Each structure stands twice: as C-alpha cells, then as structure tokens.
Curated annotation (Swiss-Prot):
InterPro entries: G3P_acylTferase_PlsY (IPR003811). Keywords: Cell inner membrane, Cell membrane, Lipid biosynthesis, Lipid metabolism, Membrane, Phospholipid biosynthesis, Phospholipid metabolism, Transferase, Transmembrane, Transmembrane helix. Pathway: Lipid metabolism; phospholipid metabolism. It is an enzyme of class 2 (transferase). GO terms for biological process: phospholipid biosynthetic process. It comes from the Bacteria. This is Glycerol-3-phosphate acyltransferase. The keyword Cell inner membrane applies. It is found in: Cell inner membrane. It is a multi-pass membrane protein.
Length: 226
C-alpha cells in the first residue's frame, strides 16, 4: 500500500508541475521581451496574452494551457493502466472508487499550479483554459457543454471574463445533469468557485461597466486597480 500511495502522490505532484508550466509568461517574454505580469490584468493566461500579443499567440497559449489540464488527467489513466499491468495496485484498493478521486485531486493540483505557479513565485493565470482541458479529459460531454455556455455568452457579450464566470457556474450543474461521479461533481463546485474567485477584479469592473470586451485593452486606471 505504501508504494501505491507514493505513486498516487507523485501523480498529484506532477499534475501540479504541469499546471505550473508558465506558457503565457514564456510566450510574452520570448516574443516581446516583457513580463506579462506587469501589463494588462497581470494574469499569465490566454486573455492577457491576446491583449498583449494578438490573436495568434493568444490562441497558442490557450491551446497549451488547455493541454496541461488534459495531460494531468491522462497521467492518472496512465498510472492505473501501468499499475494494473504490473500488479502494483493492492487488492484492498477498489479501482472504480479510487480513480475518480485521484482524477479530481490531479485536476485540482493542475488548477492550483496554473494560478499559483511554483516557477513564477506562486503567481499565474485564472485557470480557465486548464480547467476546460480537465473537464474534457474527465468527460468530453461535460467539457463541451461547459465550453458551449462560454461560447454563447462570449458571442453575445464579447466579454471573456463574464463568459468564464458563467461557464464556471454551469460546470457543477452539467455534472449533476449528466450524473457524473460524486468526486467530479465536487470538483465542479470547488473548481468553479475557485475560478470565480480568481475573477474578483473582473467582477468589480463588470459591476462598474469598465470591463473591456474582446479587442479592447484595459485603460491605465483600470490596470492599476486590477
């Protein structure tokens, strides 16, 4: 059991490190020579990269951040497949019960890694794209439904933060409707709340009517309050 618990713990740590990989920071540093945390909203996520570098780099970072979430969950699947083939799973372990919980822990670790990166002094992004990758890997129907909510809201409002918040609210509802395992539902609730909390400054700007739409940049006054 000790070896099994160590393997599970290692997967969670690696998931955090995957989430911590600072794609947005590296992209802006390499292409523009500046620290993205010092411009715009200060976030290292795809939206701030979009405002700083444009659509191409923004889409690239979005894809990589999403991939980080997918890989974090794929690690869990790989562990169970490898451990099963090598007879490393103790007979007392119920795989059907353990796997959803470990998937959830790895997902939470990746989200925390993206927003609190060990490589950036525990700063980072708002974990939206990484969360989407996790959801798609957990259950593609949940991921697509959540992305659908995001897409509809962004098409109507042209405000990414509002769309992200609405998607975060929708996750747990979609999880319940599609009868997902309890750990996944708890992930939807906890992850959704965390993403919303990461958007506190955006919510303040939304209420004040100063949140920029796609294609607009934050004003100097807004940047200073972000």
């Amino acid at each position: 059991m000790g070896l099994w618990l160590s393997l599970c713990g290692a997967v969670v740590v690696v998931a955090y490190l995957l989430g911590s990989f600072p794609t947005g920071y590296i992209a802006v540093k390499q292409l523009k020579g500046i620290d993205i945390r010092e411009v715009g909203s200060g976030s290292t996520g795809a939206t701030n990269v979009l405002r700083t570098l444009g659509k191409g780099p923004g889409a690239f970072v979005l894809g990589l951040d999403c991939l980080k979430g997918v890989l974090a969950i794929a690690l869990v699947d790989y562990l169970f497949n490898f451990a099963t083939s090598q007879n490393l799973i103790p007979t007392t372990v119920n795989v059907q019960l353990w796997q959803p919980w470990l998937v959830t822990l790895a997902g939470i670790a990746a989200i925390l890694g993206h927003s609190k990166s060990i490589f950036l002094g525990f700063t980072g992004g708002k974990s939206v794209a990484t969360s989407l990758g996790i959801l798609l890997a957990m259950n593609w129907q949940v991921g697509l439904a959540t992305f659908g909510v995001f897409a509809v809201v962004v098409a109507i409002s042209r405000i990414v933060s509002l769309s992200s918040i609405m998607g975060a609210i929708a996750v747990s509802i979609v999880m319940v409707v599609l009868q997902q395992p309890l750990p996944y539902i708890l992930f939807g609730i906890a992850g959704g709340l965390y993403v919303i909390l990461r958007h506190r400054s955006n919510i303040e700007r939304l209420l004040a009517g100063t949140e920029p739409k796609i294609g607009q940049k934050l004003t100097t006054e807004t940047e200073q309050s972000a």
